Amino acid sequence: MLKTIRYYLLTTVQNPVVRQSLLTLLIRVFGVVLLFGFTLFLTQKYDPKLVGQYDFVRTFLFAIGSICLLGFDQSILYFKGRLYPNYSLGHLKKVYLKMVLMLFLASLLLFLFFVLLDASVITLFFADNTTYFLLFKASAVMFFYGLAILNVEVFRALEEIVVAELFRNVFKYLPIIVLAVLLVQWQLELYLVDALLLSFVFLGIVTTVLTFYFFTKKTAICTTDCFSAREIITQSFPIAVSGMAIFLMMSFDILFLKKYQGYAAVAFYSVAVKLMTLLSVIILTINITVSASIAASFSNKEIEKVQQIVQNSSRLIVAITLPAVIGLLIFPEFVLNFFGPNYLAAKEALVVLVLGQGFCAFFGSAPVYLNMTGRQRIFQRIVLGALGLNFILNYWLIPSYGMLGGAIAFSASAIFWNFGTALFVYYKDGIKLFLS
């Protein structure tokens, strides 16, 4: 019996796909641990208002950065696939350079918008004098932020998978961690947001240098220009719509909380959201692992095999997430108290967010199924519907219920998106995405 188990374990570990998946999972878990360690440091050493400003600017970069990127970070892999089997590094480099130029122009337009915008508009909406200057500074470094995100996905396209995962999950936190520690030592905590922005400038420069280094490692032969700028945008933007919608869905609650409850509430709520991301990382990692298998089996019309894959992934996701969900639901105060007694204010929001994410876990591969089976536009419509619901619920609930309202809005829209996808797939393909 033990020999049989040992044989299967060794066979599994020796599989290159499994080894890559395990290494990716290990790096991502380490990244989550690093993020939570840094969050603990911030909540212990910095005033909640400063932490709230940090999370507010970070959310702005995520949401608006996804728009400035126009989906290039996702479509770079698509263009590499389009070039296969007659793959040329030179062609991919030309695509990359055009993407960088268009990212720069989009970032420049954003910066000019804030230069020309009357500061009183932002001041009146958020009811304070600091928000405009925070957003202005963030828009000034948007190009470097977008460049860092794009470069990491270029690493993946160049098959530097480990480097890509390290930057995406670990290295991107190191500059801000170092700067945040130094600010505490120098008693300059007020400059936390500036440190965050400088860290993205640093990451943008470093990843660009590495990108050109990886391009020069191989011979780049390119005699023609494969894709025009117009074609790049045409192919990239539809791919990005669902991603942008999801980022915005994770931003509306922060924006409305800042408007109605201030930066401290943003800090408290952001901790609850980060705890919820523990569950989403598990779901995302497993779905990334099975997405290629879903695409291949569906393409070959092996519907029974697709059903088996999605059911196995659903069982695995639930098996791993359920203990974490139960733990967070039973001990929310114990967990939040690690971040400081003030953060207990997010207890109700945490419970709702965890319940919502736990419910979504039962839908397994819903986040990737439609994209992997050629129904990207259907998925976009579902996610855009969820985004509209998210905005309406945040608009109506946060003024009255604060953090709890934001948690209800996010959980309801996430459940709508997963349930809508599962319902469509069952109706069209006869595939049960939900655990059964």
At which residue positions do the language-model features occur?
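Membrane-water interface segments that mark the loop-to-transmembrane alpha-helix transition
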Residues: 20-31, 57, 69-119, 303-324
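Interfacial segments at transmembrane-helix termini and the short loops linking adjacent helices
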Residues: 50, 118-138, 263-264, 304, ...
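Interhelical loop/hinge segments that connect adjacent transmembrane helices in multipass membrane
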Residues: 2-17, 186-196, 208-250, 293, ...
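Membrane-interface junctions at transmembrane-helix termini in multi-pass inner-membrane proteins
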Residues: 144-167, 354-382, 425
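Transmembrane helical elements of multi-pass membrane transporters/channels
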Residues: 20-39, 168, 172, 195-215, ...
